[in-house]
Amino acid sequence: MKISVAVSGASGYAGGEVLRLLANHPQVQIGAITAHSNAGSRLGELQPHLYSLADRLLEENSVANLAGHDVVFLALPHGASGEIAAQLPAETLVIDAGADHRLVYAGAWQEFYHSEHAGTWPYGLPELPIAHGRRQREELRTTKRIAVPGCYPTSALLALAPGFAAGALLADDVVIVSASGTSGAGKAAKTNLLGSEVIGSMAPYGVGGVHRHTPEIEQGLSSVAGEQVTVSFTPTLAPMSRGILTTATAKVAPQLLKETSAAQLRQIWVDAYEDEEFIHVLPEGQWPATQSVLGSNHVGIQVALDERTGRVIVCSVIDNLTKGTAGAAVQSMNIALGLEENLGLKQLGVAP
């Protein structure tokens, strides 16, 4: 018997990407597809690329329509998913692609999101190292509630986590700059996302430690490092529809810097990800490009040592809608249900 799945928020980019992946999942039967303001519309009017689901009608975004499924994906703005999730049955696997359940500390949530904290769920980044040589996927095997990471934190955490897990990096001097495609800002019409504003131009935003993903990045790195990690994070809007390129740098521990070559430092990342199907530390001299991961759940990483400054430089690329959102959601679902982790996620990147 197939697994019945409902998707809430199906008219947006994240919800549409969840449906795209589920449409190719061999163990899934797509049930209710819901939306808020677009309820009653044909899915094909809003997600024209989803041909096999085009004639499905979007139902009202209500608990009544979502309950009764084995799995519910919530692809909703922050604040909305927490309210619905609290009313869903405990036996339903609920996967929140929004921000509501990512942060551990209520104070951090209130500071950056300016609303009441909905609580914390297990973090849906399976490859993230946790205590005693384990991975976050162990936390996902026995849960019915999963918080999908933000797209920027996904690229940043996967870039730096191996170094912090190995005790190779200092916690007080971490700088992360990420360039993202416009789909990361959602579907709502905004002047700064118009083609005439974006094409041929790049611009930073959320500068000065105010971007909402900053505490999530610090939370993830701190949990890996076992101490408080402070991050300077700057996001940049790039003239592309999807993809994230992150350049993350951190000071290497002085004693390690004296005793370790650049090749040995890089090997920390190679060893950390050698058994991970979706994460690829590229051959030396090959730098990751967003094009290579578009539409896929894969991650490209390269590591270098700046010997002059004593900093490690890690570049990572993801598709913000796939590994950065929907791919992580489906991957986490597979783990929680005891399925093969790569089901519905075997697509390779699209190039050129």
From Swiss-Prot:
Pfam families linked: Semialdhyde_dh, Semialdhyde_dhC_1
GO biological process: L-arginine biosynthetic process
Gene Ontology molecular function: N-acetyl-gamma-glutamyl-phosphate reductase activity; NAD binding; NADP+ binding
Pathway: Amino-acid biosynthesis; L-arginine biosynthesis; N(2)-acetyl-L-ornithine from L-glutamate: step 3/4
Localization per record: Cytoplasm
Alphabetically ordered keywords of this record: Amino-acid biosynthesis, Arginine biosynthesis, Cytoplasm, NADP, Oxidoreductase
Main location: cytoplasm
Enzymatic reactions: N-acetyl-L-glutamate 5-semialdehyde + phosphate + NADP(+) = N-acetyl-L-glutamyl 5-phosphate + NADPH + H(+)
Family the UniProt entry places it in: Belongs to the NAGSA dehydrogenase family. Type 1 subfamily.
Protein name per its UniProtKB record: N-acetyl-gamma-glutamyl-phosphate reductase
